[in-house]
Amino acid sequence: QNDTPFGYHLFIKRIIQKAIDDNVVERYHFMLFRNLLEKTASFLGYNNWGDLLLVEGMSDEDRKGYIRFINSASHNKVSDLEAKELKPNEKNLLKLLFETFTGEYKWKE
């Protein structure tokens, strides 16, 4: 089953889900999530991966803020921020966005 073209995507999904389940989310999990969003957006024909962030009641301003945070966690050039532990609300943000994303797009194992 892991030899399918989507084996990589499922592997990344499992890594992120395990980090959420074990409450050990780190900055690099946001990078992995962005990678998953980018690949899914490309597959589904979206121009922007941020369009896949579909939390009910989320405003455009919230979406832009989430995208900025994911970008900063993914492309961080400041070493001080690399080592900085995530706050509980940042860990919860990944959980909210990831679980909404996997639910909305009907991801299966």
Indicate where each model-derived feature is located.
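Structural motif
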Residues: 21-29
